[in-house]
Amino acid sequence: MNEFRTARTYNQNHVPRPYTPGRRRLSIYVAWSYPAEAGRNPAELDNRFSTMTEVRRVTWPAYEDPKWSDPLRFQQGIAGGLELFFWGWLPFQQFVQETTGHPVPVYQRVDQAGFHTPLDERVLADTDTMFVWGLDHMITGQDATSAEIEAVRDFLTREGTCLALGPHHDVGASDDLAVREIEYRHHGDALVPRQQRFGRYTRSLIAGLGVPVENRYGLRPAVTEGKKSAPLSIARDLDTKRWLEGVSSFNFHMHLPHYAVTTDDPNVIHVLGRQPIDLSRPHPFTEAGNTEFNMFLWMPPSGDRAGDVIMADTTIFSSLFGVDESLRAFWNNIVSAK
């Protein structure tokens, strides 16, 4: 028996989902150009994804099953590394569909076939919770247009909407190679180059919408019980919408962004979850006296904006980095938000 109840398809347009009271419609927008990412020269050291061959070598023997290692079944270049993301998101998509009855479409800014899909009303019209995942390397030049920013702003005027922004890490922003090496030694992932800067699209969207947050660094969480992330420091008094109810920790990932708040007004955005950092590995951020980084943030509705804005990294929604009851509780909170 196959794990999927229906056969997979490719190369067709999305069928709009009807509004169903009490059952949210979630959509995912991956803000990369797949051809730009997959077409990066593997001879370049920085600002590219790993090839599948590199993944297999570093994580050996995790991907030595022919399902992953046979070049007749799975791409071995950078494209293969990209496809792992889609595999990792499937359990979250299935969880949402089982909970809401609605499928979760995954849009790409530019997909494998070269089709360009802007974040416009076609994507937003049948969506209640919109995930925008900033996995685009800055070097590929993805920027939100003024029309896209206006479309998202209009989306957020609708009652009950939620925009979930997830710019990924920004490793090696310094021009000082010694600092880049310190950052690399801190996270310890051989698959991440000394410079890997993500999220140009989400940064431009964030700026256009006036969200006072910037993704910085790639920080390694403190751990307990092997590779389980240390519990979050949660501001439950500020979490009036119960985003983190029943949540103690997120899944472990070696390099996560610090969502730096760029306003002094404490009422604009709430830092609900902070992640303790592995202090055994030096990093400029910890050397400045920081012991935690901002992991989950919430902007409550304000003014003409009737919808919520949350900040959460893409890894929280990927099974590649593990799924436990705490993470499922978080997923359920996102799906059932009122």
Q: Can you say where each PLM-predicted feature lies in the sequence?
A:
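Short, surface-exposed patches at the edges or C-terminal ends of soluble domains, predominantly
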Residues: 1-338
